[in-house]
Every structure is written in C-alpha cells, then in structure tokens.
C-alpha cells in the first residue's frame, strides 16, 4: 500500500525450437511486459508465414462474425442482463504449435466459409435487386402523369427521347434554348412532378451533343426508363409483384442465415479469438533478438510473479535456458513500468488513479487516500439520504452482478457504493430526504408546521457554517498533499525542494488554521507561525526563481488561494442538490392542490418520482465530476505527477476460449 509493486528485470536466452511454446506460455501467464532486446550483434526476429496467416484469418473471421452476429437471435439482454450478466462458456483448445492451429483454422474455414459466403452473396444480390426495383417503381410513379406506353419514351433510330426532372422556374427558358439550338426540330412535353417539372424532350439524334449540353447547363436530372411495355400504372403493378417476390426470397435467405448463425456463430467466434491472440502474440517478435540457433527476450516482471514465471520457463525449455533475474539499474528506473499494489478494499479505486496517471518509481501511490477522500467529497456534494440510497441500491446490484468479471463496471459501481454510503451518512446529518420531503410529510402527519426531521445543520438556512466546513476540509486536504510532497522530496534527496516548495505551505496552513480557531492564547503563536511560513515562502521563491521571484510570489500565492477557494464547490453543490429537490417538492405541492378527478395527486406523484430520479442522476454526475476535479487539479498538484509508465503485460485476451498448453 502507498508503494507500487516491486519490479525486476528478466533476461532469457534459449533455443529457437522453444520460441513458439515459450511465447505462448508467457502470453497466457500475462505477467511479463516484454521489452526490446538491445543487442547489436544479433538479428531482430520477424513474423513468419503462419503469423501472417493468423492476421489474415483474423480479418476474414471478423467479417464472418459480423455477418452471423447480425442474424443471430439475441441471448438475454434487458435490465437483468445489465445488472447480472452471465459468464460466457469457454471452450478449451489444446495448443501444440502455431502450425497446427493454422491447419485447424483452415480446415474449419474450408467447411463453413463457403456456406456463409454463399448465403451472404445471395442476400447481397437480392438486396441490390430489390433496391433496383424500388428505384424503377419510383421512376414509374414520376411518369404516371404522362399516361402513355413507356416504350415510346426510349431512344429509337433517328429520334432521341430524353425524360428528366428540372426546376419549375427554368422550364420555359430550357424550352426556348432547345428550340433555338435545334432550329425548332424538337418536341417538349412538361408535367408537374412534386417540387420539380417533368419534361419529355424529343429531338433528332444528330442534335444529341447540342441537347445534352443544354440539359447539363439547366441541371436536368435524367430518368432511366424501366424495361417493359404499358402505361406507368400497368408497369408499376408488374414491378410491385417482382418486388414482393424478391422480398420474400430475401426473407427466406435471412432465415437460412439465422440457421447458419445458430449453427456456426460460437465456433467462428472461438476460432477468431484463437487467431486474434496469435496475431497479437506476433507483435513482440520484432522485440526479440535471434541467431541461427537461439533467441533472446527481456522484460519486466512484478516480484511476486517471478517464481511462477521461472518455473514455467524451465519446464518449457527443459532446463535448456539462460535465465537472469536482476534488480533494475539506476538508468532503467525511468523506463521501469509501474503496477499498483493495494489491498482489496482500495483496488477498485485504482481506476481513478490510472485515469490521471500512475506514479513514478519515486512517488507514492495515492489510491488508499483517494478511496476515502473521493467518496467523502462525493457524499458531501450529493448530501441527500434518499439520493444516496438510490445510488447505493443500483451500485450494490452492479457490484454483485459484475464482481466475478472484475471489469470496469464492477470497479465503477464499487466506487459509487462507497460514495453512496457517505451520501447517506451526510444526508442524515443534514436532514435531507429528497430535499425537504421528510419535513413536509412530518408537518402533514403531525399538523405542526414547524416539525422537521432531525439534522445537525440545515445547509439552505445556514450556508455560512457549511461554507466554513468546506473550506476547512479543503485546507486539511491541501495540508495532506503538501505533507506528502515534503516526505517524497525529502526521501528522494530533493531537500531544497522539500524545504522551500512544500514546507512553507504546510506552515502557512497551520497558521491559518490556528487563526481561524480564534482560541484565547493562540493568537500570538498563530501569527508567528503564519509569518514564519510566509517568510520561508518568500525566501524559497528567491532561491528557486531568482530574478523572477517577485512575479512568482504573486502567482504562486494567488494560485494557492484559488486552489483553497475551489473547495467551496463542496458547499455549492450540496446547496444545489437540496435546492433542486426543494423546487421539485414545491411543484408537486402546487399540482397536488388540483382535486378534479384525482388529476392533481396522480400528476404530482409522476412529477415527484420522475423529478427526484432525474435530480439524483444529474446531481450524482455533478458530484462525480467535481470530486475528480478536486483531486486531479487541487490535491494532486501539491505532490503527484502521475508521469509513470503503466505496466502493460504481454497478455492474451480470452472470453470464449481457454488454452491448454502442451509442453
């Protein structure tokens, strides 16, 4: 706790014949972050033809999964599935070598891909044909006002017929231009067609170029005349029959696709996951060094996993390997990855730390601290017992349903569960139950207009004590941050930074706290401490910034004041939550007074529950964001950089498959 997991450097040299099996073992173990071997005398390894095939088959099967997934019957879903998702069953694959896996994949694809591609091609062809028929029906609908055999509208010999749509306002201008260019050797028919005019132009074939130039100039949208004979209405009936037939064929094809999805979807997904992991596994090959007989790899391993990894390497290589495990050198510390290490109760809060950035090797891990302070700030800003209860119930259900997955949803819900506890606690202390709803109920039941729920403090009626409490919390939070910064810098040998950058603010905060306490006998001591802190701060600015000291004194001082005052948002959001809830209650009271056919109470209940649920969601979102901001900007700015490199192990991703490695 407070310190990341210890890391050691692993170096391995072994025979090439163990490469595939060893990489597969490390990939499944997921405990080593592989790094590039920096050796000038050896060659870099490269993916072979089987790795390239794995990448190719991954793309092919992604398309098959996408197609089959579209026509697969949805399993589960809904609210229950959201809260309590089921684990996907995993099939075991006995891994011997990459060549054998590729052979199995090719055998599987040779069986299922032709079936799937055939039905996919048939469906694509039918869909294209249906769209073509719909387009032709649309054209026939436009031609309906002409009421002539559409065969007359096609080109025939020396006469050329063009049918199209043009802007109504340009019809006369177009007709005049055509007559002029063709020396009146043209016939023009116009009909109204929705927002444009339908024009039929009959001209001599020799005038083709002249006519087409004018059609382009006047933006005439040409229509392709559908095949067949008869009036547009007669042909529309024929095409509608064709459309119905093709749509029926498409539905039959979709049913066949659904059957194929039920039959093959899980298998395709299984083999896709196998080749996906092989493709990902091949990405480390360029990091390895090799000779004709051997290869070398290096990487970082968390100390607790070292023994397991060493035993696995020795077993796979039959002891024919050079293995070196050593402490990181001084020049390697900056590139050493960081894996957070926290007790179970704080582990989900690592998500908040990682969103900002993991600590450097010489920093502390703030996760255990923010596990408490973040939840407390969230609760302080939401500050309503029943809002906290709603958030807590939802979070508890998600925690129960997602715990086995340990996924992002579980971690987020766990954080909300702790935050809901503090929301309920502080809501009870401030007497807020859907705002003043509890007070209204008590007054209605007892008939006493002064009755109210027990509370330690009413934020809406006594905002100043609430503001002072928020600022006091902020001062304590900043003091903790500066203290941690002092300890870190002192321990890392930066004594000047500890004394001149961290210590002055610690002393100033103590002085401010003593002055604010207004206790008799402490006034002189408080002023002396505050003066000492300010003097040390000024000296520190001179030592660190030299000629810019005067400017930096103003900047840093007002920066500190700004950070401190930022904690006033604790009070502001608490008041906003109570205020919104109270407004909803006032609206409900106004509507409730309508007694006609019980409309008032019915609408009032809808407004009450709908409004309070909306208020819970919007205020919880605000509390979540602002609690993060107080940590990321104000708190972390005092001691934490988050510039470490996150530990990213060479690890497989498996949801539906499980590998059994044959050694």
From Swiss-Prot:
UniProt keyword terms in alphabetical order: Cell membrane, Hydrogen ion transport, Ion transport, Membrane, Transmembrane, Transmembrane helix, Transport
Record localization: Cell membrane
Pfam families: V_ATPase_I
Major localisation: membrane
Membrane topology classification: Multi-pass membrane protein
Gene Ontology molecular function terms on file: ATPase binding; proton-transporting ATPase activity, rotational mechanism
Residue stretches spanning the membrane: 376-396, 412-432, 468-488, 497-517, 534-554, 568-588, 589-609
GO cellular component annotations of the record: plasma membrane; proton-transporting V-type ATPase, V0 domain; vacuolar proton-transporting V-type ATPase complex
Family annotation (Gene3D superfamilies): 1.20.1460.20, 3.30.70.2170, 3.30.70.2750
Any one of the GO BP annotations: vacuolar acidification
Disulfide pattern: none
Family: Belongs to the V-ATPase 116 kDa subunit family.
Function: Component of the A-type ATP synthase that produces ATP from ADP in the presence of a proton gradient across the membrane.
Subunit structure: Has multiple subunits with at least A(3), B(3), C, D, E, F, H, I and proteolipid K(x).
Protein name: A-type ATP synthase subunit I
Encoding gene (name): atpI
């Amino acid at each position: 706790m407070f310190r990341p997991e210890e890391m050691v450097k692993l170096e391995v040299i072994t025979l090439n014949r163990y490469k595939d099996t060893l990489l597969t073992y490390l990939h499944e173990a997921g405990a080593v972050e592989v790094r590039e071997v920096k050796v000038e005398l050896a060659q870099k390894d490269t993916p072979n033809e089987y790795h390239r095939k794995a990448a190719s088959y991954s793309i092919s099967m992604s398309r098959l999964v996408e197609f089959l997934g579209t026509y697969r019957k949805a399993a589960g879903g809904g609210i229950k599935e959201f809260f309590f998702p089921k684990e996907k069953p995993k099939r075991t694959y006995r891994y011997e070598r990459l060549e054998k896996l590729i052979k199995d994949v090719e055998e599987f694809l040779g069986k299922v891909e032709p079936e799937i591609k055939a039905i996919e091609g048939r469906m694509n062809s039918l869909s294209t044909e249906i769209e073509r028929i719909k387009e032709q029906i649309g054209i026939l609908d436009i031609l309906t006002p002409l009421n002539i055999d559409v065969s007359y509208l096609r080109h025939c010999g020396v006469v050329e017929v063009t049918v199209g749509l043009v802007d109504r306002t340009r019809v006369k201008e177009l007709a005049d231009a055509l007559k002029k260019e063709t020396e009146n050797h043209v016939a023009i028919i116009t009909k109204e067609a929705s927002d444009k005019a339908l024009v039929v132009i009959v001209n001599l074939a020799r005038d083709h170029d002249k006519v087409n130039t004018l059609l382009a100039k006047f933006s005439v949208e040409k229509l392709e005349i559908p095949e067949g004979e008869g009036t547009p209405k007669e042909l529309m009936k024929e095409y509608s029959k064709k459309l119905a037939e093709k749509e029926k064929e498409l539905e039959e094809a979709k049913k066949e696709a659904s059957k194929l999805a039920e039959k093959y979807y899980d298998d395709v997904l299984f083999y896709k996951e196998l080749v996906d992991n092989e493709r990902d596994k091949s990405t480390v090959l360029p990091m390895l060094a090799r000779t004709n007989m051997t290869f070398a790899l290096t990487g970082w391993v968390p100390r607790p996993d070292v023994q397991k990894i060493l035993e696995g390497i020795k077993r796979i290589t039959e002891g024919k390997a050079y293995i070196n495990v050593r402490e990181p050198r001084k020049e390697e510390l900056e590139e050493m990855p960081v894996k957070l290490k926290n007790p179970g109760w704080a582990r989900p809060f690592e998500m908040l730390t990682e969103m900002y950035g993991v600590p450097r090797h010489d920093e502390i891990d703030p996760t255990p601290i923010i596990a408490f302070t973040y939840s407390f700030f969230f609760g302080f800003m939401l500050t309503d017992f029943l809002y906290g209860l709603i958030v807590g119930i939802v979070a508890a259900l998600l925690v129960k349903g997602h715990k086995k997955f340990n996924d992002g949803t579980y971690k987020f819900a766990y954080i909300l569960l702790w935050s809901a506890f503090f929301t309920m606690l502080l809501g009870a202390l401030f007497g807020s139950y859907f705002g003043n709803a509890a007070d209204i109920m008590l007054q209605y039941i007892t008939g006493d207009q002064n009755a109210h729920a027990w509370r330690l403090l009413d934020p809406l009626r006594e905002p100043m004590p609430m503001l002072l409490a928020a600022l006091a919390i902020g001062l304590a939070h900043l003091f903790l941050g500066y203290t941690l910064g002092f300890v870190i810098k002192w321990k890392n040998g930066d004594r000047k930074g500890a004394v001149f950058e961290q210590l002055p603010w610690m002393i100033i905060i103590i002085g401010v706290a003593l002055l604010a306490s207004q206790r008799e006998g402490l006034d002189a001591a408080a002023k002396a401490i505050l003066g000492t802190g300010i003097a040390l701060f000024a000296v520190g600015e001179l030592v660190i910034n030299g000629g810019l000291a005067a400017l930096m004194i103003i900047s840093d001082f007002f920066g500190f004041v700004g950070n401190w005052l930022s904690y006033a948002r604790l009070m502001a959001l608490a008041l906003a939550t109570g205020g919104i809830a109270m407004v909803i209650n006032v609206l409900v009271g106004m509507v409730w007074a309508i007694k006609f056919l019980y409309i008032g109470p019915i609408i009032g209940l809808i407004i009450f529950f709908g409004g309070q649920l909306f208020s819970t969601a919007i205020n919880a979102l605000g509390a979540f964001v602002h609690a993060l901001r107080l940590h990321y900007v104000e708190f972390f700015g005092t001691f934490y950089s988050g510039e470490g490199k996150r530990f990213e192990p060479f690890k497989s991703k498996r949801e539906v498959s499980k590998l059994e490695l044959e050694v």
